[in-house]
Amino acid sequence: MMTPESVCAERGIDLVYFDGRDTDKKGIYNKRANMIAVNAYLDDVQYRKVVYHEIGHVDHDPSQYDRRREQYELQADRNMIHYLVKEVSICHNSRLKY
């Protein structure tokens, strides 16, 4: 079964958690550390969305983020959607097998 944790492990990305109760941040990707930090207080759906979105930033150049913010965020959102659809497809296919 595909999970955010398994995708991070396959890509060599460390996944850590932070206490996000006093911030509006849900997650962040740190390229130098190749690490995704996720708010530990997200529900399961938000957690999956955030991790998959942050994975979408892996190939982005942090020095270009201010200039290309909209493009980078849209690419990260597409990445999130890709993984969520893949999860649903895997789940659906496993239910079809008797």
Model regions and ranges:
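Active-site hotspot residues in diverse enzymes, especially metal/ion-binding acidic/histidine motifs
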Residues: 1-98
